[in-house]
Structures are given as structure tokens and as C-alpha cells.
Amino acid sequence: MSESYAKIARDGLWDKNIVTGQMLALCPTLAITGTATNGLGMGLATTVVLILSNVVISALRKTIAPEIRIPAFILIIAAIVTVVDLALNAWLHDLHKVLGLFIALIVTNCAILGRAEAFASRFGVLASALDGLMMGIGFTLALVVVGAIREILGSGTLFAQASLLLGPHFAFMELQIFPDYPGFLIMILPPGGFLVVGGLFALKRIIDARKPTIEQEIKQMRTERVFTAAGVLKPKLETGEEA
């Protein structure tokens, strides 16, 4: 069971990351990540929707007829998004004004409907909640990384206006990375989003291509340690020769 939960976490955070792994939700990723603060706010809102929709759909999976499951999933997701939208408007009004229409457009996010269809409709509530949480955290991390890179290169700040958008308790996050920075306009415009997201895609592919080699080296080192402890192999000196 712990291994399956670990796989759910690994899929959400890395292997099937909504942005870098599945290349979904690119519209909000490119549009609202001009700052890390906006990315964090959008990511947290999407995480709440993912968790709640997965839990509700998993709990109702045996009562929803297969023929109408997609419309039913969309209605459930739309209801949850409406609640989140109203909550943001009530308690984080400044952030709601910045994110604007993209909160309502969470309903059309393919990743949320995809997790409902591929996971929540087939597995239990606990596993579905974990899947929603991990997918949401992975999505939030991707948005924050994209937003941070664009904000640092574009305006020389990090988490600017966090206290205004997220509340006064987040004032400690506001950083001025480059004082008197003239700015790099293209990075806070949509073309900058394409450049940063494309770079993250390439970086993930490079890391994934190296993973089999790294895992093989780790496995070989563990095997050698076992055999050395058992006396089958002699320990090696620093020069690489056997003692």
C-alpha cells in the first residue's frame, strides 16, 4: 500500500506533472505566471478543486451511470469551482481580481477532468484525495517556478505584492532580488512564458533521460556493498584496485 501511495506522489510531483509531464493547463500557466505570487494563488485554488472533485467523484463512483459520467463529472467540478471562486472573491478579493476569469476557467482544465476519469472514478476516496493533493502540489510548484523565473528576470523581484494578494501574513515572502533593476519586459509578457515553460520541458526530458543510468549505478553500488559485507567481494581502494 505504501508503495502505491509513493507512486501516486511521484506521478503527481514529477512523472505525470500536469505542466511538465502531461503538458496540460498551459493557458493559465502562460497567462497568469507573470509573478510567483499569481502562480501560487492559482495553484492553490486548483489544488483545492482537484482534491474536492476527486473525493466527491470517488465517493459517488458507484452511483453514477457510465453513460453519463462525463457530464456528471463536469457538473461536480463546476459546482466546486463556483464555491472556490466565491470564497476567493470574499476572502482574497485582490487576488481574485488579478486571477479574474482564469478561476472560472478551472472548470475547463483538462487535468481535473482527466484525473476524475482516470483515477477518482476507479479508486477509493483516500487514494483519490492523495492523487488530487499530489497533482495539485505538482501543478502549484510548476506555476511558482515559472512565475519566479519570469518575475526575477522580468522585474528583479520575487513574490511581489504577496501581502496584498494573499494577505498581510505573507509579507515575509516579498523579496527585491536586483535593486534598481531596469527590467526585461519580454519575460513578464506571454512570449516569456513560452520561453520559460519550454526550458522546463527540455530540463525534465534531460533529467528523465539520465534517470535509468543513475538508478542502474545506485543499484550496482548497493549490490557491491552487499557482496562486500558478505565477504564475496574485497573492498576497493581509492585507486579503484581491490585490496
UniProtKB/Swiss-Prot annotation:
UniProt KW keywords: Electron transport, Membrane, Nitrogen fixation, Translocase, Transmembrane, Transmembrane helix, Transport
Disulfide bonds, paired cysteine numbers: none
InterPro entries: NqrDE/RnfAE, RnfE
Membrane topology of the entry: Multi-pass membrane protein
A Gene Ontology term for the protein's cellular component: plasma membrane
Ranges in coiled-coil conformation: none
Pfam families documented for this protein: Rnf-Nqr (PF02508)
Keyword match Electron transport: yes
Cellular location(s): Cellular chromatophore membrane
EC number: 7.-.-.-
Keyword match Transmembrane: yes
Bilayer-spanning residue ranges: 40-60, 72-92, 94-114, 129-149, 152-172, 183-203
The protein's enzyme class: translocase
Induction: Expression is reduced under iron-limiting conditions.
Alphabetical GO biological process terms: electron transport chain; nitrogen fixation
Domain of life where this protein originates: Bacteria
Subunit structure: The complex is composed of six subunits: RnfA, RnfB, RnfC, RnfD, RnfE and RnfG.
Primary role: Part of a membrane-bound complex that couples electron transfer with translocation of ions across the membrane. Required for nitrogen fixation. Involved in electron transfer to nitrogenase.
HAMAP family from the UniProt entry: RsxE_RnfE
Family: Belongs to the NqrDE/RnfAE family.
NCBIfam families reported in the protein's UniProt record: PRK12405.1, rnfE
Name this polypeptide is given: Ion-translocating oxidoreductase complex subunit E
